[in-house]
């Protein structure tokens, strides 16, 4: 099947859902050769991925993953990476605030690819054990309301594609598949992307994958987060319906920050930034966390406004709840 798929892609022809599913199954089972994987990814990149293709690929990744079967609603906050901004770990820090506000967070991520410090690097520096399996993380969700699923542990089938991705050295569909392949099938999600053109298509993909409430965001300064430095494009998902709008920090009482104020460092520096924010340090970094945590709380709890979410995030930090969550 993958040979036929490569032929079609090289002729700029879209794949059917079945072709996309079988091709990804061949890649993730070791059936496809390295040359076939490289050809497939390159031809797909040159053609451009469709919503149906991305949905099918993500479904295969979820099926192949070690999965967490959890009864309650779960929230995921994640970015694609690739924005080359070297910010501190905004989503990771926001995750503690979201969880401390009473929302169960099932975060999924990896070590750094394009920045100095990925989510896994920062959490490791904070003392988090990365190699927890599904049963252990289900227990974490029950006991503390938050878990981290280390991508290599949960997506072992990626081992066939990973060397090819490194050798290719270009963005491929896998750059966007990771955030779409949460092993706990979180049904509420805030996802940041590195390109404006991805916002609405990936919101449709998330909806296809069963996300009931969520949003895909792109900061107009290039961040794959809700930025504190500019406006952010948002495509919100609510029960299969999409709504696109811009979010401006100034509408929530925050002046624009300078991008240099959001820059982080290595994993130890970023871990300390996270500790400082959760302990109540004010400034642009806190504002970035409040925007992302506030939007997440709005998406996770029915009947709130974004301002309500930001207010809850502030209160969660100021009362010490987020700091305590990071020290559990």
Language model region names:
Residues 39, 55-58, 136-140, 217, ...:
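Beta-strand segments within the central parallel beta-sheet cores of soluble alpha/beta enzyme folds
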Residues 14, 83-84, 111, 120, ...:
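Gly/Ser/Thr-rich beta-alpha loop segments that engage phosphate groups in nucleotides
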Residues 22, 56, 60, 96, ...:
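Alpha-helical scaffolding segments of alpha/beta enzyme cores, especially the outer helices
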Residues 1-87, 101, 105, 255-262, ...:
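Acidic, glycine/proline-rich low-complexity segments that act as flexible tails and inter-domain linkers
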Residues 41, 88-144:
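A glycine-rich phosphate/pyrophosphate-binding beta-strand-loop-alpha-helix module
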Residues 79-84, 109-115, 154, 220-221:
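Acidic, glycine-rich active-site loops and adjacent beta-strand->loop/helix elements
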Residues 18, 35-38, 92, 117, ...:
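A generic alpha-helix surface/boundary motif
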Residues 8, 63-66, 87, 102, ...:
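Glycine-rich anion-binding loops and their surrounding alpha/beta cores
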């Amino acid at each position: 099947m993958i040979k036929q798929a490569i032929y079609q892609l090289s002729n700029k022809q879209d794949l059917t859902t079945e072709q996309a599913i079988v091709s990804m199954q061949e890649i993730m089972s070791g059936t496809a050769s390295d040359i076939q994987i490289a050809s497939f990814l390159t031809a797909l990149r040159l053609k451009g991925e469709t919503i149906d293709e991305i949905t099918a690929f993500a479904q295969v990744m979820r099926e192949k993953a070690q999965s967490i079967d959890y009864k309650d609603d779960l929230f995921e906050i994640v970015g694609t990476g690739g924005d080359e901004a070297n910010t501190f770990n905004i989503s990771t820090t926001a995750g503690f605030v979201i969880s401390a506000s009473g929302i169960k967070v099932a975060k999924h991520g990896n070590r750094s690819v394009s920045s100095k410090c990925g989510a896994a690097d920062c959490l490791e520096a904070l003392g988090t054990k990365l190699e927890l399996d599904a049963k252990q993380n289900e227990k974490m969700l029950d006991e503390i309301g938050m878990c981290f699923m280390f991508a290599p542990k949960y997506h072992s089938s990626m081992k066939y594609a990973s060397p090819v991705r490194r050798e290719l050295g270009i963005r491929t569909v896998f750059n966007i598949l990771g955030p779409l392949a949460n092993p706990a099938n979180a049904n509420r999600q805030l996802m940041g992307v590195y390109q404006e053109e991805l916002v609405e298509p990936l919101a449709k993909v998330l909806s296809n994958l069963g996300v009931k409430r969520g949003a895909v965001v792109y900061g107009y300064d290039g961040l794959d987060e809700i930025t504190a430095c500019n406006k952010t494009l948002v495509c919100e998902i609510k029960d299969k319906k999409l709504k696109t709008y811009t979010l401006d920090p100034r509408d929530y009482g925050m002046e624009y920050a300078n991008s240099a104020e959001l820059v982080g460092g290595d994993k130890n520096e970023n871990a300390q930034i996270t500790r400082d924010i959760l302990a109540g340090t004010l400034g642009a970094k806190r504002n970035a966390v409040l925007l992302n945590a506030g939007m997440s709380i709005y998406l996770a709890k029915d009947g709130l406004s974004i301002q309500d979410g930001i207010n809850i995030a502030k209160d969660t930090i100021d009362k010490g709840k987020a700091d305590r969550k990071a020290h559990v």
